[in-house]
Amino acid sequence: MSRKIKLFPCLRVTLLLAAAFLLGRAAAQVTSSVAASHSGQIQSSAEGNWGLGFQEEGRPPVGNATSQELAQYDAFYLGDTDKKRIYLTFDAGYENGNTAPILDALKKHEAPAAFFVVGNFISENPDLIRRMEEEGHIVGNHTSTHPDMSRIATLEAFREELEGVEASYKEITGKEMTRFYRPPQGKYNVENLKMAKELGYHTFFWSLAYVDWYQDDQ
């Protein structure tokens, strides 16, 4: 919310450090953003939707903001590309019986993952949240109501979207939530990244997405 695990169509699995998948902006816009990256600032044309563009085979994808530009806001979409490592992440917006089998598969293969959960998922599935935490997975913040965060202009409103999930997680597990944040639908702007950093969050995008939100195409 599964990417490329066809059994699990309701959760988005994103693979960082994988081959590219085009999302959001057109390739021309991505190229323009990368060409302008010498300034070290995220270009205004990159704001709104997180987007990726293909390079040659075997090369990491190009985002509409570079790793260096994102890093100044504690934001990421790639890890160390010299290492053969992937990061499994799931955006969990609702539950239809697939999360437990995903956790079973991860446990079988001793594969840790990160689950970015929204408010209704965490409040309606406390047993799954506890299991994620107990089995060594990261539970990250995907906001309380899954809004277009790029339209949120104040720190107060931004904080409100994150604090509800934090509070639910602590109530369920007795622990503080890891401050990892994924913008719903990948919609963001530079001010959002600054707000997330001010609140102590790392923002995580993706380098490959399995398009499972089109359920009829699975």
Language model regions located:
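N-terminal Sec-pathway targeting helices
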Residues: 2-16
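His/Asp/Glu-enriched short active-site or ligand-binding loop at hydrolase and phosphoryl-transfer sites
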Residues: 193-218
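Helix-enriched interaction subdomains in cytosolic or periplasmic regions
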Residues: 38-59
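Active-site beta->alpha N-cap acidic-glycine motif
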Residues: 52-150, 164-170, 177-178
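Short, solvent-exposed loop/turn segments at secondary-structure boundaries
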Residues: 150-155, 215-217
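Sec-dependent signal peptide cleavage junction
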Residues: 24-38
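Soluble catalytic domains of enzymes that build or remodel membrane lipids, polysaccharides, and related
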Residues: 159-164, 173, 194-195
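Extended hydrophobic secondary-structure segments that form protein cores and membrane-embedded regions
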Residues: 180-183
